[in-house]
Regions:
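Charged, flexible boundary elements
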Residues: 1-13
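Long, charge-rich intrinsically disordered scaffolds of nucleic-acid metabolism proteins
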Residues: 88, 102-164
Length: 164
């Protein structure tokens, strides 16, 4: 017999100890999906002009200020983006700015196999963010993070791809 009878299923709460963001990069815009402490489990979406690193860092600073106003605490920024044609330059810049940046192999993210799924940047951003949260919780086989090559190695790879 239970000491405290349950009225139903309990919600699973996740303690958010950082500002998490996924980056969907395109030629014209970067879509940022974020989850911040003190907002419950509501994800926010923001757009930054492609290549505008200063605008991206301003967005992260704004998210940090808002989270601090809600909770009274400062939080690190943790991001995820898919490995792709853009290379690893943004990953390196984010790390230099003090952001914990992760690059994921897009083929490694678990997806439902039986059903067809809509493909939109909004859904991709949410999927990436959920994968990052699961990865940071230590869940096994969630996704495979890519080790960023050195700039020199990346240049060598690019030359080989352009010749091929």
């Amino acid at each position: 017999m239970l000491d405290h009878p349950s009225d139903g299923l309990a919600a699973i709460r996740t303690h958010i100890s950082a500002i998490f963001g996924s980056l969907e990069l395109s030629r014209s815009a970067w879509l940022v999906t974020s989850l911040s402490p003190g907002k419950g489990e509501k994800m926010s979406r923001h757009s930054v002009t492609a290549g505008d690193v200063a605008g991206l860092m301003k967005l992260f600073a704004d998210l940090g200020r808002k989270a601090k106003a809600r909770t009274g605490e400062s939080y690190p920024i943790i991001t995820i983006q898919e490995a792709g044609l853009d290379g690893f330059w943004l990953h390196r810049v984010l790390q230099q700015e003090g952001v914990e940046s992760h690059v994921v192999d897009p083929a490694s993210i678990a997806m439902p196999r039986r059903s067809r799924r809509a493909k939109t940047d909004r859904l991709d951003g949410e999927t990436l963010l959920r994968a990052l949260l699961a990865y940071k919780r230590g869940e096994p086989r969630v996704c495979a993070m890519v080790v960023a090559p050195s700039p020199e190695e990346e240049d060598r790879r690019r030359i080989c791809r352009e010749r091929g």
